[in-house]
Amino acid sequence: CLRDQEIKKISVPHRTYISVPFLASKLGIELRWRDEVWQDYYFIGDTNIIDAAVLWEKNSYIPNTFMCLSFQFRKHLSLGRGGMILTNDEEAALRLKKMSYDGRLPDIPWREQDISSIGYHYYMTPETAQLGLQKLPAAMSTKPKKWTIEDWPDLTIMEIFK
């Protein structure tokens, strides 16, 4: 989403997982820290992009946003790695799909496509997707962990972020 929207600067809470600040560094995005006590999700800066990596609640999608979910091993639907972006913007969904899939459309052999956008090889393998479908009923019937701000360290005191 940050690449798709060509975001130049973001802010994130002091207490969060390290992946968003690392991604900002990787993409050359200016990073600012903010004091925020958040629960379940937070907006990334002044964007409509939401870090919802620990959110697990029925009908929780916020319209006109990009909600980034995580299936990392400590999450409620644990697949080891990977995630999903929820959006109701069909054009953006197609662009993001192409970005995740080497810049190509998934249903046409790549050699037959005139690839017009860069891709990043971030797609979920069919095997991981199948595992997710197998685990989904149990995840839906199990109460999720309620993460709190204390579950996250203050990243600003880590050497890498000084």
Predicted features and spans:
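Nucleotide-sugar donor-binding and catalytic loop/hinge architecture
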Residues: 62
